[in-house]
């Protein structure tokens, strides 16, 4: 197994730098079910942020990318169930992907709700806005 940093994953996804994109694509194509590429939760969160801020991708587009990565047999995503729940909510709910990841982890951990002062994060149906 190998691990990928955000910049390698982004180069693979956007193919905007020919040399780096070729290297990233080659590396990922060499991955397999027996020798997978591993992506951390942090890489997933940072990748979404980069796709939003630097490449102006919409939440729906990014959610589709995330589901494609989740379905790839040669890629293992840390806490994949959190990423799947967050990707689904992110595509439709309006809060930041990182907020959805926080809520997904809290749900998985058995929390009853997650309290926040962040109005956007409170859009998640699991979150409770602390001060109105």
Placement of each model-derived feature along the sequence:
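Acidic, PIN/NYN-like endoribonuclease modules and their adjacent C-terminal/linker elements
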Residues: 1, 103-132
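Short, well-structured N-terminal submotif of metal-dependent ribonuclease cores
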Residues: 1-39, 54-61, 67, 119, ...
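Short, mixed-charge aromatic SLiMs
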Residues: 33, 67-76, 126
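Residues that scaffold the ATP/ADP-binding catalytic core of kinase and kinase-like folds
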Residues: 11-13, 50, 124-125
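Active-site neighborhoods of divalent-metal-dependent phosphate/nucleic-acid chemistry enzymes
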Residues: 74-117
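Short glycine/serine- and small hydrophobic-enriched flexible loop segments
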Residues: 49-53, 107
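Amphipathic alpha-helical segments within well-ordered protein domains
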Residues: 48-49, 87
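Alpha-helix capping/helix-boundary segments
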Residues: 8, 43, 82, 101-102, ...
């Amino acid at each position: 197994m190998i691990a990928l940093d955000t910049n390698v994953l982004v180069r693979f996804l956007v193919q905007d730098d020919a040399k780096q994109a070729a290297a990233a694509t080659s590396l990922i194509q060499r991955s397999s079910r027996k020798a997978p590429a591993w992506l951390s939760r942090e890489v997933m969160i940072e990748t979404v942020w980069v796709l939003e801020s630097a490449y102006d991708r919409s939440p729906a587009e990014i959610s589709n990318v995330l589901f494609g990565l989740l379905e790839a047999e040669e890629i293992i995503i840390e806490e994949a169930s959190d990423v799947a729940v967050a990707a689904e909510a992110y595509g439709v709910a309006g809060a930041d992907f990182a907020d959805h990841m926080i809520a997904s982890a809290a749900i998985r951990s058995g929390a009853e709700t997650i309290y926040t002062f962040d109005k956007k994060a409170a859009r998640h149906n699991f979150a409770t806005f602390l001060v109105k």
